[in-house]
Amino acid sequence: MKILSTIWATLSDLFYNSVFQVNLEFGEDDMCGVLGLVSHEPVNQLLYDGLQMLQHRGQDAAGIVTAEGSTFHMHKGKGMVREVFRTRNMRDLIGNAGIAHVRYPTAGNAGSSAEAQPFYVSSPFGIVLAHNGNLTNTAELYENVCNKHLRHVNTSSDSEVLLNVFAHELRREVSKNANPHRLNIDNIFNAVAEVHRLVRGAYGVVAMIAGYGMLAFRDPYGIRPLVLGSQTDEAGRKSYAVASESVAFNALAYDLERDIQPGEAVFVGFDGTLIARQCSDRAKLSPCLFEYV
């Protein structure tokens, strides 16, 4: 047994060091929980209940953003879900779509309320993003984002860097349009494809683009999990959910549809239309072993 334990410890160390080698100047959110919903009814309580089911994935901080038309409403802070969200906070989270996050920090950002997710950028269109995983080339990405593309990163979180990488690529795609002030689905998926090309490491992402819809995507190796669920109401209208684990759907009375595939992106418009596309030519499932412990 001692020999087996030693072998397991060695393999675990090798796996972690090869896949999750990080720059400790940046905060890395290793095993966090993400959740996203597009519904035909208010989602604030659903997001809260779903986060409670994901609480085991992160106890350091929690956050929710809802979308009311093209307006975002956000509340986030340090602590457990029940500590961060009071009745007055929940009342302010208006809208039929939203994303949420619970954080379990592993380096750099423990104790920082500023690095609670989701993160927000105003351009292009207004984007909020929550991320589970950790990036291995954060320093390089930060250099490009801040010094080359002149974007501002306010924290040491690799998730904020990831958001700015996506935002820059989306802006670049939209600028090619005949009408550079309007977004189309190809712009979104092409931007995700560029994220896959540029970013190294693990990421399961949920995001919202103001006035358009919710986006979810998974790194080309599927290191972190991401699942798709749905619910059909009595009128035949379908609502969609994305989460780090299907256990979140239990609290929502949503059905598990499938895993989001490595390299795949799923976009759900605020009208309830779902479109999915493979955005990587190197997709290969290599999940994190620790997700099964």
Predicted regions and their residues:
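Conserved short alpha-helical segments that host acidic/polar catalytic motifs at enzyme active sites
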Residues: 7, 11, 15, 20-293
